[in-house]
Amino acid sequence: MTPSAKRRTLNTHYFMPPHVRVVELMTSGNTAPEIMSLLVDRMKTVGLKPFVAKRESTGFIQNRVWASIKREMLHVVAEGIVDAQTADDIFVETIVRPGTRPFAAMDYVGLDTVANIERTYAQERHLDTTYTVDYLQREFIDVGKLGIKSNKGGFYPPSTAADAVSTKPRIFVLDNGLSGQIDNLKQGKILEYSFEGEYIRTVFKDQYLPDGIAVSQEENVLFWTCMGSPGQKDGMIYAGKLDGNDIRPLIQQGIVHTPKQIVIDEANKKLYFTDREGLCIWRCDKDGSNLEQVVVTGDNNNECDRRDATRWCVGITFSHTLGKIFWTQKGASKGWQGRIFSANMTIPPGETAAHRKDKVCLLEGLAEPIDLDFHESTKTLYWTDRGEMPFGNTLNRLRFDDRGYALHTDSTPHLKHEIIARKFHEAIGLKIDARNEHVYVADLGGSICRCKLDGSDKVRLVFQEDRAWTGVALA
């Protein structure tokens, strides 16, 4: 190879499966720096994520690290410490799902502690300490860089070391399948996106008009509703693992009509979901058992009631702080008939789901309210509205006092609540990230947006014209 050709030669490593957009670049030992820079820029423009190794290394970066992980995994299985399934499971639960970054985690634990742990392993297994304990001692510990507990930081600068450890939620969102070519109504999907809005994978597909979704953090399980054919009694409730396995029906066809938003009451191990044409709100155990109605808004055997959109329950949430459930009855499309109600989580003694004296209409005359969520620490109800301007296609909120009474505001003229974000395109899905003080909104126009709790700093994370997003959840 000529000297000129050597300067234009380098090593590349692409990844499988194809949705992993990472590519590793590594010098051949003679590669011109400008060639590396050129390729990095070009790869970014086509949606790849290039990573550059500073010097030649067998296995590039990722596979060299992966090789060491494989070795230790094989050791714990071969030594009889654990079986392969358990080793995989604990790795996923402690590293993959939380999004743990090794160097950030070491900073968090403390590099002096990390060195002591590695020293113990080295003594027990007769390992070389040149690139572990000795490296940490020389480059970090001896100069006072111990991680986030020291003002000099560690592998990360002190201002970012703690932030690097914090986990960002993964986004799970429903595509109802109605935005593209419609050959049938069972083209819905559940997709996963990163915190930054990058597509990760399709978790489940071939869903029958999926609408509401919730995540059980305790069990790493997705719950979602499939509306079925509008007006027919063929809606279903499903559950499935976050990893895309073990999909199973909780509520079979023939029981509910058109299930919409679904939420999880982890404290009581219950699911709540609305049933639009069923004219009610249901509650059941997380395995689908003990199904019961908690609110009934009309007679679903009566054609007039079933066609009356002012009786249609769509959004549902609850507050343990206030002991209340909240729901929307949306009214006709763009009809300014929408209402938001509340009632106690427990049906009063002697009353029924159809006849509850504790039911309160909080707001009425709304453009078209859809999904709900509740922020416990501020006692604030949030909802999406897909109605017309000026008050539709918005993100809204209503605050409550300690007794559960609504605190009406005049911050938006003619309204008793606040509009905090606007200009969505058929806003539907809603989820609050209380830890990071964010709100996520998904709309039928193909956008997934995030903003702060007050509606500021709104950003569009995802825009796909061929998607019609409904429910959104976080894990």
Curated annotation (Swiss-Prot):
This is 3-hydroxyacyl-CoA dehydrogenase-like protein LAM1. Its EC number is 1.1.-.-. Disruption phenotype: Significantly reduces the production of T-toxin and decreases the virulence to maize. One of its GO terms (molecular function) is oxidoreductase activity, acting on the CH-OH group of donors, NAD or NADP as acceptor. PANTHER family: 3-HYDROXYACYL-COA DEHYDROGENASE, 3-HYDROXYACYL-COA DEHYDROGENASE FAMILY PROTEIN. Belongs to the 3-hydroxyacyl-CoA dehydrogenase family. It comes from Cochliobolus heterostrophus (strain C4 / ATCC 48331 / race T). One of its GO terms (biological process) is fatty acid metabolic process. 3-hydroxyacyl-CoA dehydrogenase-like protein; part of the Tox1A locus, one of the 2 loci that mediate the biosynthesis of T-toxin, a family of linear polyketides 37 to 45 carbons in length, of which the major component is 41 carbons, and which leads to high virulence to maize. One of the PKSs (PKS1 or PKS2) could synthesize a precursor, used subsequently by the other PKS as starter unit, to add additional carbons. Gene3D superfamilies: N-(1-d-carboxylethyl)-l-norvaline Dehydrogenase, domain 2, NAD(P)-binding Rossmann-like Domain, TolB, C-terminal domain. Pathway: Mycotoxin biosynthesis. It comes from the Eukaryota. CoA binds at K149. Keywords: NAD, Oxidoreductase. InterPro entries: 3HC_DH_C, 6-blade_b-propeller_TolB-like, 6-PGluconate_DH-like_C_sf, 6PGD_dom2, LDLR_classB_rpt. NAD(+) binds at G99, T100, R101, P102, F103, A104, N245. The lineage of its organism: Eukaryota, Fungi, Dikarya, Ascomycota, Pezizomycotina.
